Design a protein with these regions (language model features):
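Phosphate-binding site recognition
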Residues: 1-321
Length: 322
């Protein structure tokens, strides 16, 4: 395992689940690019018996279908050594194949199964959640050496469908971890570990720009100044993060364009707007769908809701978190 900056609590929790001696179903969530996949891969690199990542819905000329996701899952099974089974036609079949694979591979040691970007796999009318429930409730929770780790950047999906699930997965999670961006001290440690020399003033400046997201910080070139790095990442021709706003929102939110409009509007006013004001400026109807978008943006750590000093609760405002 390479050096991991921070994350001491999260690593300790993961190791505690690993050594529990019982079936574990752990959900990890947090902002995209915050380092969830990196953390799991580093901690369980030598113990992972199966690893799968859902197909991204972004950067495609057509919407990713159920068939695409099932084929990708099937290929992951083959890649990890499964033989003699045809491609599944449903998630029920796919998870049954995973059961058979784990049974035939079982030597009594801990079996770590990591399914990354779980929300992407839940395409419309796919029956994915029902199949996941059947896999865990009917088989997985009886396997004392199984540790199922699921991960997702679509925080609202993770909260609604797993952590706060009111259906068949209610109370089934044995652990949950929310991964946060680096603190200012962790940012300093990160830059030092990469031999990036910056004054503390510039580290604070970088923190205000990048928000403590390690994926972005990792692009810094040690031979460039802070201003040169920011220019190269965001403003130069073919900038690595030039289209990050669009990519990020399209990969997380169902109504990406509307969510981006809300962010653009709030970016013009530090104090934010009330729900009604925001709906009017965005030219949206302040109905349940609008409320759901606001909740999704809050749960994904893009917005906060607050009451200005001296105001009543009816004057709640929404503003950008960073």
């Amino acid at each position: 395992m390479c050096e991991i900056i921070g994350r001491k609590y999260e690593i300790a929790e993961l190791k505690r689940y690993y050594n529990s001696g019982r079936a574990e179903f752990v959900a990890i969530y947090g902002r995209r690019r915050v380092g969830k996949t990196f953390l799991i891969n580093e901690v369980f690199h030598d113990d992972m018996i199966f690893h799968h990542t859902g197909l991204s819905p972004y950067d495609r000329q057509r919407r990713v279908s159920l068939k695409d996701q099932l084929q990708n899952f099937y290929f992951s099974l083959i890649r990890h050594g499964m033989e003699g089974m045809a491609q599944p036609k449903s998630w029920m079949e796919a998870f049954f194949m995973l059961e058979r694979f784990l049974e035939t591979s079982d030597n009594g040691s801990r079996q770590v199964v990591f399914i990354d970007e779980l929300p992407w796999m839940d395409t419309a009318r796919s029956g994915f959640l029902t199949a996941l429930e059947a896999f865990w409730n009917g088989w997985g929770n009886t396997r004392h050496n199984l540790m199922l780790i699921v991960c997702g950047s679509a925080t609202s999906w993770m909260l609604d469908n797993l952590i706060n699930n009111k259906g068949g997965l209610y109370g089934r999670l044995t652990g949950e971890i929310k991964l946060y961006p680096f603190t200012l001290k962790e940012c300093e440690d990160f830059y030092h570990s990469r031999n990036i020399q910056m004054s503390r003033y510039n580290i604070v400046q970088a923190y205000m720009i990048l928000g403590g997201i390690p994926f972005y910080m990792n692009f810094f070139n040690p031979s460039l100044s802070l201003a040169q790095n920011i220019d190269a990442l965001f403003f130069s021709r073919n900038a690595k993060l030039g289209d990050e706003f669009n990519r990020l929102f399209n990969s997380i939110f169902d109504h990406a364009e509307e969510c981006m409009d809300i962010i653009r509007i709030l970016g013009k006013r530090h104090a934010g707007y009330t729900r009604q004001e925001l709906a009017e400026k965005a030219k949206m109807i302040p109905n349940g769908g609008f409320t759901k978008m606001l909740k999704a943006l809050i749960s994904s750590d893009f917005l906060i809701k607050y009451v200005p000093f001296g105001s009543s609760n009816r004057e709640e405002r929404y503003k950008l978190k960073d």
